[in-house]
Amino acid sequence: MSFVEDYLTKLQERPTIIENPNILKGSKIFNAIYRVDDFVYIHIQSIKSEDGYNQYNVIEPPRPTHDEMEEIEEKFALSIGDKEPPEDTKEKEKLIRSILDKILLRMRLSVPKEYVIYHFIRDKLYTGSLEPLIRDPYIEDISIPGLGHVYIVHKVFGPMRTSIKFENYEELDNLIVSLSEKSYRPVSHNRPVVDASLPDGSRVNFVYGVDISRRGSNLTVRKFSRVPTSITQLIMFGTLSSMMAAYIWTMLDEGMNLFVCGETASGKTTTLNAITAFIPPNLKIVTIEDTPELTVPHSNWVAEVTRETGGEGTIKLFDLLKAALRQRPNYILVGEIRDKEGNVAFQAMQTGHSVMATFHAANITTLIQRLTGYPIEVPKSYINNLNIALFQTALYDKKGNLIRRVVEVDEIIDIDPVTNDVVYIPAFTYDSVQDKMLFAGKGSSYLIENKIAVKRGIDRRNIGLLYDELQMRSRFLNLLVEKKIFNYYDVWDYILRARQMGLEEAIKYVSNI
């Protein structure tokens, strides 16, 4: 593209052109360009900015002049008139393109027509100056802390400072208002803090106005993946081991209650979404979230989202969770428990509904303190309804790369009648030196030996069969990784096949692919 060549001529040192940034993973020194699409290229540099960040420079086609854009907008408004725009975003884009094609035929422009169309659609339909970051699949998070540069977290290079910059409050406020309106949750001075979803599904938090955000309005975007990360990808990334995944598979087969816990940005929702593929296919699932992130492969899936109106029409997680109990679900999945809906979740467990959720807690002690304290206030006698607590964290490896690891999986057994403490057993622990998940092995799982064995009618002499089954499930998942079966829905299909054929036959089948 000519605009990329124009950019390159202004550089003192020509960067390397690469197809995939992953080839530079672990590199301390880099200067490269990669393509996002025909109109967006990214130049990444290890040259530190004054605030210590590596550089992320967006390369886009030049914009038409301000006067040209004003004229185009006026003509567009006249052309579209009172036409009702289509609901579907892609159909809207088609309509805009067809109108612009006619308008631009009769205009003399300072830039090529396709550049004008790109910028018009980028600004009017999508996310404006942030759109290149939304389109880049290697970005995890986007942060506008106020006036100044936009920052990102890159999947390969970690935190970076972008070339996108806001220099006045009006420009920044206009973006925040525009994006919140496109998210159908508009900000205002009466409602300055809003959680919403962008048109592509990414989760966004808006804080509007200099009166509450001293450096100007701010936003944080957590990028959304259209196809969820699969359990085999998490095994390949090292987030969890195949044995740990096999253990979770076994537990979800038996309707166990499970929380995925960790700090912010530790990958809790990603893991929760990945393990939903282990829930038996013939069960009814209800997902309850503030912003829609969970994607469940099951056909009998009810997806519910809260509604914030600031008045009587507000629907909170608490309301949806109470309603879900009347919908006869087999599994209830809550995007994140943080308030009194946690109490309802434990009542659901008490009445025989299986529940999974994410939760902010770094360890079992913090988990219990938060669950039993204000505002959740779960009675301690209810805590053992939660069978499994999985703890995940984000950390840096020896090369300085950001990685995510499940560092402990605890089985919650009971409440000690003397000390009133929660009794639990760590089923898996993490060895940070070897970067390995350690399974305590045969005889170590209370849930396998005292719940699953009893449920299946297996006597204590034959409990070893359940551990053998764990090994087979682990082997099956390892084979999927070896065969590079990573697509979320493909993995789901192979798990269904294993259910139909039996594990032994499924292992033979995958081995011969």
UniProtKB/Swiss-Prot annotation:
Changing K284E: Does not affect ATPase activity. Shows a reduced ability to form hexamers upon ATP binding. Its cofactor is Mn(2+); Ca(2+); Mg(2+). It is found in: Archaeal flagellum; Cell membrane. It catalyses: ATP + H2O = ADP + phosphate + H(+). Gene3D superfamilies: 1.10.390.40, 3.30.450.370, P-loop containing nucleotide triphosphate hydrolases. Disruption phenotype: The deletion mutant lacks flagella and is non-motile. GO terms for molecular function: ATP binding; ATP hydrolysis activity; metal ion binding. The keyword tRNA-binding does not apply. The keyword Hydrolase applies. Induction: Part of the fla operon, which encodes the seven fla genes essential for crenarchaeal flagellum assembly and function. Expression is induced by tryptone starvation. Keywords: Archaeal flagellum, Archaeal flagellum biogenesis, ATP-binding, Cell membrane, Hydrolase, Magnesium, Membrane, Metal-binding, Nucleotide-binding. Its main location: other. Changing E336A: Retains very low ATPase activity. Cannot restore archaellum assembly or swimming in a deletion mutant. Does not affect ATP binding. Forms a stable oligomer after ATP binding. Shows a reduced ability to form hexamers upon ATP binding. It is a peripheral membrane protein. It is an enzyme of class 3 (hydrolase). Mn(2+) is the preferred divalent cation for ATP hydrolysis, but considerable activity is also detected in the presence of Ca(2+) and Mg(2+). Optimum pH is 6.5 for ATP hydrolysis. ADP binds at T239, A265, G267, K268, T269, T270. Component of the archaellum. FlaX, FlaH and FlaI form the core cytoplasmic motor complex of the crenarchaeal archaellum. FlaI shows ATPase activity, which provides the energy for both archaellum assembly and rotation. Hydrolyzes ATP with the highest rate, but is also able to hydrolyze GTP, CTP and UTP. Cannot hydrolyze ADP into AMP. This is Archaeal flagellar ATPase motor FlaI.
